[in-house]
Swiss-Prot record:
Homodimer. Gene3D superfamilies: 3.20.70.20. Belongs to the UPF0210 family. This is UPF0210 protein Asuc_1169. NCBIfam families: PRK05313.1. InterPro entries: UPF0210 (IPR007841). It comes from Actinobacillus succinogenes (strain ATCC 55618 / DSM 22257 / CCUG 43843 / 130Z).
Amino acid sequence: MSIQSNEILETIRMVADQNFDVRTITVGIDLHDCISCDIDELNRNIYRKITTVGKDLVETANILSAKYGVPIVNQRISVTPIAQIAAATKADSYVSVAQTLDRAAKAIGVSFIGGFSALVQKGMSPSDEVLIRSIPEAMKTTDIVCSSINIGSTRAGINMDAVKLAGETIKRTADITPEGFGCAKIVVFCNAVEDNPFMAGAFHGAGEADAVINVGVSGPGVVKEALANSHADTLTEVAEVVKKTAFKITRVGELIGQEAAKMLNIPFGILDLSLAPTPAIGDSVARILETMGLTVCGTHGTTAALALLNDAVKKGGMMASGSVGGLSGAFIPVSEDEGMIAAAESGILTLDKLEAMTAVCSVGLDMIAVPGKTPAHTLSGIIADEAAIGMINGKTTAVRIIPVTGKDVGESVEFGGLLGYAPIMPVKEGSCEIFVNRGGRIPAPVQSMKN
């Protein structure tokens, strides 16, 4: 792939005019050496390790941002799933651990900390259940702690007992946090990845080093402008434009990641290629799809356009870096994408269409606000549907859904900042309560048997 002089100028304009940024430098920290039978000692150990390993992260990001002229929007921490780390305490609540994570993250100045998590794709240990039941109070009493639950995988199937509990947990969190905001910090996964730098689903996987740097880039506005200014006629040419643009975006992220690793003396892990939108005008994944030829995101052809975008981003990014990982694709969070917001408000982008789109993009149903009266079993049904797509197709899928207490279809909710605002979207009539209450496990599909 040859690089022309005008493309170098385009790279400069990416930052100046097109909202390009490095969305996050995330340091993953292993907490296994913090384990103790005493929960107070565990909390002290966790605080000490996070504040020691992560103490220079924010300063390093600021130095690199000034040096290269590229905004680095967030600095974050991910930790080993707390359900594993706190198990030895035999405590009946892990809220104090969440509060320790919150204090430690604030002490070093990072934006978010992830890893208040449980991996329950095949079954729940007592510690896993304690953690999940602690999530509502943890989200209520902390500010920047993020939580995730992995309830299924292609190799294990879907743990429907965990799906039921996850729905109840989200509903409870919505009831006790203002406008359900706590739910914006909870993700339910199928096939969760261990090196995700993005929140709210980041955790530090069991196969990772003691500490590692993972970087997430963001450039929907860059891709849209490249398409708008190109002479691409066919979709083949559109894919080529996206691929070349993703290459340039990825090279910047790779540079930042490698430099951060040197300065912090922490190994560089992965670069996540995901196009992560913001509520800002000109920073929208939906608008990219519309630039390809759709009148509005959500109309017929949207899933195909998104598949093209996702694949071209991966191809361009893989050529630019040997460290591609995480989720790497295109995010479609409704409240964080002004184009998605507009399409949802018009009624054209629906929950059903979003579910179809998740079969071909990076993650899943993300930052979707639903009526506060939505029952827990409906939330569980939505999670199960999304998990089934991930399980059968061997990809990561997820649900981050916010039942907004006291609000109904036709209203909207304001989250602020990068989380934006969202119209309340309708859910289906009818009930899946009997199905969800059956529990058990949806067996792993035939394609899980690969050995």
